[in-house]
Amino acid sequence: MTIWVDADACPNVIKEILYRAAERMQLPLILVANQSLRVPPSRFIRTLRVAAGFDVADNEIVRQCEPGDLVITADIPLASEVLAKGAAALNPRGERYSEATIRERLTMRDFMDTLRASGIQTGGPDALSPRDRQHFAAELDKWWLEAKRKKESM
């Protein structure tokens, strides 16, 4: 089990939660980005720097993740690809992706694109709230417990 992070767009507060979780869970945490990242010294935490470019980090995560891994991303197409490989996906607000939630998100994204194309100002997502951070941490723990149980039952 490895936790992969689409790190270029991941909020720092979520990375901090992940650093602590990697130590507590004693799981590898790999932050994939096209820029240098500062991470705390740990035998569980490492960075993987990729070339700059469209979807380069996403493609590397898809290439390396395995069934049972967890991918942290807000990128819906990336979440869809890792689910197809048997990994789990969680966004920084604590929403676990499923095929149904991905379809719903893609429909909403297409709708918002249509609104923007017609000249309507739609704005961006709300800032990450303390409640979002708590929800993320709770879902991360839930994933870990489920994965641990599954591994022990094998």
Swiss-Prot record:
Q: Which domain of life is it from?
A: Bacteria
Look up the signal peptide feature and give its range: none
Q: Which InterPro entries match?
A: UPF0178
Q: Which Pfam families match?
A: DUF188 (PF02639)
The text of the family note is:
Belongs to the UPF0178 family.
What is the protein's given name?
UPF0178 protein YaiI
Organism of derivation: Escherichia fergusonii (strain ATCC 35469 / DSM 13698 / CCUG 18766 / IAM 14443 / JCM 21226 / LMG 7866 / NBRC 102419 / NCTC 12128 / CDC 0568-73)
